Amino acid sequence: MNSYLQFPHRKLFIQFSYSLTSVFRKCQSRTFMNSQFASAKLSNSIKKYFDGRIDESIKYQEIFIRGLENKGKLSKTSLVEALARVRAKPETVLYKVADPNENNKYPICSIISYTELSKLRENQSSRLREAEKSKHKNKTRTRYVLFSWRTDVNDIERKLKSVKDFLQDGNIVEIHVQNKKRSQPVSQEVRDSILSKIQLEIEGLGKDMKPPIVNSHSATFLLQPLVSKSSEL
């Protein structure tokens, strides 16, 4: 009697267990599908660069996909369905064009070729490089020019040309005039003559950022350009 009563329960348990197993296998199969990139041939560097923007790395269950039915029209679909379309087209990838915003509840995606994705990366990298170059190009640099009280006329002219070039290029220039080591001090007349020449040559190109520091041994000028090169362009 006991065996007979237990039999239906055992049968029911076996059926219930089998049903759970089927559901588990179904879930496991879906997880496996979503754990691998639909575009398996893409290089790891491409996947890393576009992480969060291509294939299974797109973290949305529902998306808008462009050109699914009509070119330029957005169609709502699931990520799983979109990835199935990608797998059906060799050498293609699902690319997230735009994130959700106040006008679109879901991200906008598009199916593009590997070639288009590579060009997209090249263009984005190129824009980043140009922006970095522009940032450094527009950054004001400080140039240093050293004079000696006993500098001859030709050397003064050469160094003053460097000062003018630096100012015209939009750089800050620090001019320092001092005695050479183990050289005899020069007269006040010579010092005044050199300082007057420096001030005359830079007139119209630069202005003092702070008052010059002048004493019996040295003189220091910190100049900024009157007109930067970028503002002239």
From Swiss-Prot:
The keyword Chloroplast appears for this protein:
no
Lineage: superkingdom: Eukaryota
Q: Which family does it belong to?
A: Belongs to the IF-3 family.
The keyword Cell cycle appears for this protein: no
Q: Which GO terms describe its cellular component?
A: mitochondrial matrix; mitochondrion
Q: What is this protein called?
A: Probable translation initiation factor, mitochondrial
Q: What does this protein do?
A: May be involved in mitochondrial translation initiation.
* Primary location class: mitochondrion
Recorded hits in InterPro entries, A to Z, give:
T_IF-3_C_sf, Translation_initiation_fac_3
Q: What's a GO biological-process term for it? A: ribosome disassembly
Sorted keywords for this record are:
Initiation factor, Mitochondrion, Protein biosynthesis, Transit peptide
Q: Which GO terms describe its molecular function?
A: mitochondrial ribosome binding; ribosome binding; translation initiation factor activity
- The UniProt annotation puts the transit peptide over 1-39
Q: Which residues form a coiled coil?
A: none
Annotated localization: Mitochondrion
Species name for this entry? Answer: Schizosaccharomyces pombe (strain 972 / ATCC 24843)
